[in-house]
Amino acid sequence: MAAEPNKTEIQTLFKRLRAVPTNKACFDCGAKNPSWASITYGVFLCIDCSGVHRSLGVHLSFIRSTELDSNWNWFQLRCMQVGGNANATAFFRQHGCTANDANTKYNSRAAQMYREKIRQLGSAALARHGTDLWIDNMSSAVPNHSPEKKDSDFFTEHTQPPAWDAPPLSLQGPSSQPRLQRAVAWHSRSMAPTQTCLAPHPKPHWNWKSSIIGKKKPAAAKKGLGAKKGLGAQKVSSQSFSEIERQAQVAEKLREQQAADAKKQAEESMVASMRLAYQELQIDRKKEEKKLQNLEGKKREQAERLGMGLVSRSSVSHSVLSEMQVIEQETPVSAKSSRSQLDLFDDVGTFASGPPKYKDNPFSLGESFGSRWDTDAAWGMDRVEEKEPEVTISSIRPISERATNRREVENRSSGLESSEARQKFAGAKAISSDMFFGREVDAEYEARSRLQQLSGSSAISSSDLFGDMDGAHGAGSVSLGNVLPTADIAQFKQGVKSVAGKMAVLANGVMNSLQDRYGSY
């Protein structure tokens, strides 16, 4: 088996191959200085296109780096030598493959044929030349396409002496005779000015100068973009502004009209859908009415009560499927609303959670509360004559700060009415916390407290002792004393009286302010 090429041979070979002008650009995208190669096609690629080829798979394209990889074998080098970007471009163009997409291009019939051709040429070159670095076509063709011969500078070619170019021209044979004749003619013209340097008009000298620089000047001495019309600044007239404004107004009107049309169409579609839905509801309601007519009386009543029917029901306020009716609000007959006794708990704001409820006339709260507590027949409780604490405006607290818990009410009311507690327990030798805060519910304590209250009386009766003074309440009557414990009733009564006093103070202050402000009128 032949020895593998070393790193020096690989670098020398690729330096010669990359010197070919067509191999200086990527075969797919045309990027300069490609450093990767596809052995399958013998072409040079950039790093981006090499990634695309790598994604195609090794069965379509085998990628190697011309600078980093050093494990090339002779067959791979022969494939690169017999290939090249120029040969691949000509083959693909000849077979009508002009696609830019890599997947389409390298899966085509032309790519398959070119892969087979490169493999056959590489195998033939390997069998013929073995481990020789160069092959015949490269030794004869590559120097002719070297950049030193083809990409020569124009000024260097005409300013340097032609001695270096004459020997190669003389060795080319009959095919280079016209070029040799041109070189000899140019040499004779260049020597003419030196022989006639004293002539009054050295025309050959000036002609030679004009052929070197004069022909290049017109291409280099191009003016700027000022000569081209339509690219510079133009004067704007008032007519152009008016035209632009008119176009903007027309566009704005068109947009408004389109928006109005769209809105109208949306409304029409919505009305049509609502009308259709209402018709469907009516049809369903009629069907349900027919079903309910077949039921018996009791079953029909149960169906209506449970919401199983769609007919109008007296016990149900409203149904979605029933006919729509306009509900008008009626004006209340009297300013004072009739409420039950339990609504009084919500008015005070002490035992109810949430916002307090008020009557229509806030100034009548004090009177109504006072009248309720003063009439013993209304509540069926004993009225105890106690000294009311002094109520001021500063002692009124906001509704949001009022307590919503019974224990908080007891603590706060006992703290605010400390003077009343002193008067109440002034003659007692010892008291407990339950007695002080009103939490004692024992019957013995109730009896003792009543005895202390009636200690100064000359005579007492059973109705005074047990809280049934008038005996107006029969066995079947319901009073607040039957609902709440006695201690809670007393505490609640005291709280209501306090609130009534505060409201009275507020009403008095409002009336005084009104009299002070409007009294002079």
From Swiss-Prot:
Signal peptide extent: none
CDD domains registered for this protein in UniProt: ArfGap_ArfGap2 (cd09029)
Segments of this protein annotated with the region Required for interaction with coatomer: 97-521
Molecular function terms, GO-annotated: GTPase activator activity; zinc ion binding
Annotated ranges, domain Arf-GAP: 11-127
Membrane protein topology class: Peripheral membrane protein
Matches recorded under PROSITE patterns: ARFGAP (PS50115)
Modification Phosphoserine, positions: S140, S146, S237, S240, S312, S334, S340, S364, S368, S432, S433, S513
Record-listed N-acetylalanine modification sites: A2
CC per GO annotation: Golgi membrane
Keywords: Acetylation, Coiled coil, Cytoplasm, ER-Golgi transport, Golgi apparatus, GTPase activation, Membrane, Metal-binding, Phosphoprotein, Protein transport, Transport, Zinc, Zinc-finger
Pfam family, one: ArfGap
Chain intervals annotated as zinc finger (C4-type): 26-49
Residues forming coiled coils: 242-308
InterPro entries per UniProt: ARFGAP/RecO, ArfGAP_dom, ArfGAP_dom_sf
GO terms classed as biological process: COPI coating of Golgi vesicle; protein transport
Protein's cellular compartments: Cytoplasm; Golgi apparatus membrane
Keyword Zinc: yes
Subunit structure: Interacts with the coatomer complex. Interacts with the C-terminal appendage domain of COPG1.
Function as written in the Swiss-Prot or TrEMBL entry: GTPase-activating protein (GAP) for ADP ribosylation factor 1 (ARF1). Implicated in coatomer-mediated protein transport between the Golgi complex and the endoplasmic reticulum. Hydrolysis of ARF1-bound GTP may lead to dissociation of coatomer from Golgi-derived membranes to allow fusion with target membranes.
Designated name of the protein: ADP-ribosylation factor GTPase-activating protein 2
Organism, scientific name: Pongo abelii (Sumatran orangutan)
